[in-house]
Design a protein with these regions (language model features):
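Hydrophobic/aromatic beta-strand elements that line small-molecule binding cavities or substrate pockets
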Residues: 42-44, 88, 98
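Conserved catalytic-core motifs of eukaryotic protein kinase domains, centered on the activation segment
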Residues: 77-79, 102-103
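Well-ordered beta-strand positions
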Residues: 66, 91, 101-102
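A short glycine-rich, His/Asp/Glu-containing loop-to-beta-strand
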Residues: 14-56, 61-62
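Active-site donor-binding loop signature of nucleotide-sugar glycosyltransferases
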Residues: 30, 45, 86, 94, ...
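Short acidic-glycine-tyrosine-enriched beta hairpin
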Residues: 78-95
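Short, conserved beta-strand element in jelly-roll/cupin
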Residues: 42-45, 57-74, 112-115
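Double-stranded beta-helix
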Residues: 1-16, 99-137
Length: 137
C-alpha cells in the first residue's frame, strides 16, 4: 500500500534526465511511493533548447498534464493544433500520435503518467493534415 508522501519545491531539483532533451524534470517521488504504478514530475523548458517536433506516441494507460506557467503548442492526430496556456490541463488518450511544435521560455507543467515506466515510439500520423482546433480559454 502506498504511504503518505510530500515533495516540497525547495527540496526538489531539476535534472536534465528525462524523455526530452529540451526539458528539465523534477521528480515528485510518486513513482517510488506507488511502487511504479504512477510517475509525476514537474517539467520546465530547458534554456536555449527547442522542441524537435517529432511525431510520437506513448504506450501508457493514463497521461495527464497541467500547465503551471507559460504555454505549449501541440499537434494531435485527428485533432489538430492545440495551444495550452497556464491553467490549461489535458488528458492524452493512450497511444494518441502527437508532437510538440513550440513552447515559451518559461514553460512549466506537471505531468502524471501511469504506469510509471512506459515506452515512447516514433510515429507518422495516418492523416498528416488535421483540422485546426483551438482550446477555449
Amino acid at each position: 500500500m502506498p504511504r503518505f508522501h510530500v515533495s516540497h519545491r525547495k527540496d526538489g531539483k531539476f535534472e536534465r534526465r528525462g524523455l526530452r532533451s529540451y526539458f528539465e524534470y523534477r521528480d515528485l517521488g510518486i513513482k517510488r511511493v506507488t511502487g511504479g504504478k504512477v510517475v509525476a514530475h514537474v517539467i520546465r523548458a530547458r534554456p536555449g533548447s527547442a522542441p524537435h517536433g517529432e511525431w510520437h506516441y506513448h504506450d501508457c494507460a493514463v497521461q495527464f498534464v497541467y500547465v503551471l506557467r507559460g504555454w505549449v503548442l501541440f499537434e494531435y492526430e485527428g485533432v489538430g493544433r492545440v495551444m495550452m496556456k497556464a491553467g490549461s490541463c489535458f488528458y492524452q488518450p493512450p497511444r494518441i500520435r502527437h508532437r510538440e511544435l513550440k513552447h515559451s521560455k518559461n514553460l512549466e507543467m506537471i505531468e502524471v503518467v501511469a504506469p510509471a515506466s512506459f515506452k515512447t515510439f516514433a510515429a507518422t500520423p495516418a492523416a498528416r493534415k488535421s483540422p485546426a482546433r483551438r482550446s477555449p480559454g
